């Protein structure tokens, strides 16, 4: 039957990408339908029970700055929080949290069920409705046809998914869930460029069978024995509205054990029955989250590997042994687990497995994540060749935004590489593609000094507000923070300290030595060993400001002070990076003609011509980042375009992007 109600946006899949896509489109006012094979698994953490990490935490903060759900759900469900790289500079500091699976899923479902403009429907999607070269809806497995103006496909590992345990394999989307075979076949009919990838998960262990006395305890930040005892971090910029760290459930530790020579011997004994080494698995696995058999094979000289025992929640005894993802036969899994200290009597609750699935080459996507072949069809998440909850959530939000904008008849929103990790993620995928599951790192961002976790809201919340993603409560909190940062920065720059009026004892206490001439407070704060709190207590507190005190700003006070202090200490570095951004921006604004025949650009090598013809970059900046396209090739392309003696120049667009001419 044809469902009687039409929608603006249909989202297929209810994982981390799908939920953020649906919430974003609905927040922007689009009539949105989320189709999932099982409403009970909305927001399910299919693999590890954690959110965040290096690069990944930055994405979560950006999703949050745009009104997304992941950070708040993690604050509501997080049972351990840590700031990684806390001793390093702010650009690479990252938040990571262990989450209670049940609480996380419940938080996501509540947000979905209470979001205006969003409808949920439980049915697997078997087909897409396509008229000409445009998608117009989706068809479920029982033949219900839903019409829409855009479809966001977030199928995760379900497209023709196959689970491997040893030499045994069976069709599945993940353990306990059926694969999307018909939908996979339909996408192949549409001739979208496709490949196979694989990922894996470790066996789960009953905590009652673990001897924790043989393991090393790893408390979270704020816990007894942890860093900053009594001060548990939060993820969301809006956590203060819900009590800050008080909204977290009970905090618990993780534990550490190690593999050993016996473990490695057991693993090697199973290589002849490993689907990875016997060719049963065709897909490429994630480089930065390899299976334990891959680690033992690749790093044969390493005598031991760290294994983190992570609790799955407060109401279960289940533990996730991070570091032993495997598809080895179960008898090998059983022996390798029991070979480690503390796990000698471990009971395995679920076997580890590898899952192989279809993905589609993201280089065939427009910069909005709309497919080039089918108008109105957007891809997000693992279908684009990525791995990780955070990467999926960021892509889902991005695709949901652009699907909603398309329904409004408005151009796509694409953040630049210097504006967001989301911009780096999108640009990497559409220009470089993937040869293995892609995960985010801070090292992928060349402008990471200005892409920090702490300023994600300062970078993105205004854009989110313009698009309708940010509600009044978030906007009010952001506006207070932004204005307080601006006022306090100006106050520090305009408040001068004269050596005649500053007692030497106070100068030495706070600054380390007496000052020889007049300085403003901002310049004093730039000194490596001078902190904001110490500076404002100098000389009896005469340089303090009530405007940024906890009494005035409440929970926002700490984040305002953090922004001001980072701006001062890294001012020189950030200014230099802004100069680099401006130089790079020239290429980003040069739009390439849509119908340019690169094969006719005789000055370029055959390899470069073929790559440009295949990937069809939208701007000269994108072209410069395609693998194999050299700076010399870009210069030659510029010369060819500036001659201008050919058809197909794009008209001057209204959005400020220039056309090469």
Swiss-Prot record:
<dbReference type="InterPro" id="IPR049312">
    <property type="entry name" value="GIDA_C_N"/>
</dbReference>
<comment type="subunit">
    <text>Homodimer. Heterotetramer of two MnmE and two MnmG subunits.</text>
</comment>
<keyword id="KW-0963">Cytoplasm</keyword>
<protein>
    <recommendedName>
        <fullName>tRNA uridine 5-carboxymethylaminomethyl modification enzyme MnmG</fullName>
    </recommendedName>
</protein>
<dbReference type="InterPro" id="IPR002218">
    <property type="entry name" value="MnmG-rel"/>
</dbReference>
<dbReference type="InterPro" id="IPR040131">
    <property type="entry name" value="MnmG_N"/>
</dbReference>
<dbReference type="InterPro" id="IPR036188">
    <property type="entry name" value="FAD/NAD-bd_sf"/>
</dbReference>
<dbReference type="Pfam" id="PF21680">
    <property type="entry name" value="GIDA_C_1st"/>
</dbReference>
<keyword id="KW-0520">NAD</keyword>
<comment type="similarity">
    <text>Belongs to the MnmG family.</text>
</comment>
<dbReference type="InterPro" id="IPR026904">
    <property type="entry name" value="MnmG_C"/>
</dbReference>
<dbReference type="InterPro" id="IPR004416">
    <property type="entry name" value="MnmG"/>
</dbReference>
<dbReference type="GO" id="GO:0030488">
    <property type="term" value="P:tRNA methylation"/>
</dbReference>
<keyword id="KW-0819">tRNA processing</keyword>
<keyword id="KW-0285">Flavoprotein</keyword>
<dbReference type="GO" id="GO:0002098">
    <property type="term" value="P:tRNA wobble uridine modification"/>
</dbReference>
<comment type="function">
    <text>NAD-binding protein involved in the addition of a carboxymethylaminomethyl (cmnm) group at the wobble position (U34) of certain tRNAs, forming tRNA-cmnm(5)s(2)U34.</text>
</comment>
<dbReference type="Pfam" id="PF13932">
    <property type="entry name" value="SAM_GIDA_C"/>
</dbReference>
<dbReference type="InterPro" id="IPR020595">
    <property type="entry name" value="MnmG-rel_CS"/>
</dbReference>
<dbReference type="GO" id="GO:0050660">
    <property type="term" value="F:flavin adenine dinucleotide binding"/>
</dbReference>
<feature type="binding site">
    <location>
        <begin position="285"/>
        <end position="299"/>
    </location>
    <ligand>
        <name>NAD(+)</name>
    </ligand>
</feature>
<dbReference type="InterPro" id="IPR047001">
    <property type="entry name" value="MnmG_C_subdom"/>
</dbReference>
<dbReference type="Pfam" id="PF01134">
    <property type="entry name" value="GIDA"/>
</dbReference>
<feature type="binding site">
    <location>
        <begin position="13"/>
        <end position="18"/>
    </location>
    <ligand>
        <name>FAD</name>
    </ligand>
</feature>
<dbReference type="GO" id="GO:0005829">
    <property type="term" value="C:cytosol"/>
</dbReference>
<keyword id="KW-0274">FAD</keyword>
<dbReference type="InterPro" id="IPR044920">
    <property type="entry name" value="MnmG_C_subdom_sf"/>
</dbReference>
